[in-house]
């Protein structure tokens, strides 16, 4: 167990119906907290502030910088950046709230095929920080999987696929009985 009180910043990712927070000291994660959340409820800075305060309350931390990826587009000034571009912007967009000093990391947008990455750009940046000269494709599996083409340190293009999410929507992953289609005729 690490001393979460030594954290000097927080990393936050909003993904699908999950809010995940890492208490960080430099480049090391000290603690992680995850909560299920209704993305429809995170429609304002004050709603996000309340959800984050509830999730981090057990840590009893002072006011720290909080870097956030994956927020819904529209309620911050962090306009998505068009690819090709670096995975993360030089500067995040400040969004102070009652309890936190949020720094919103802009999403990535693609014109054709139309696409938006909210949160995956930070995982790509993390991969590239460990693989400086990477030139190729990065696959990020998850409820929505991302395949991103990387060249010269930039995200050139990307494609997303509803893998796990689609499987959940279709059922428990077991094939239907052979008569299931016959019954619909």
Features from the language model and the residues they span:
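Flexible, charged surface loops at secondary-structure boundaries
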Residues: 2-6, 15, 57-63, 97-98, ...
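Gly/Thr-rich phosphate-binding beta-strand-loop-beta motif of the actin/hexokinase/Hsp70
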Residues: 2-32, 134-152
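Long, hydrophobic N-terminal alpha-helical segment
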Residues: 20-23, 40-45
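Ser/Thr/Asn(+Pro)-rich, low-complexity disordered segments
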Residues: 25, 31-39, 50
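Conserved active-site "lid/cap" helical segment
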Residues: 29, 42-62
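Short active-site-proximal "capping" loops at secondary-structure junctions
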Residues: 37-40, 72-74
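Glycine-rich phosphate-binding loop plus the immediately following alpha-helix
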Residues: 40, 107-137, 144-185
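Short beta-strand-loop/turn "lid" adjacent to the catalytic site in phosphate-handling enzymes
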Residues: 53-117
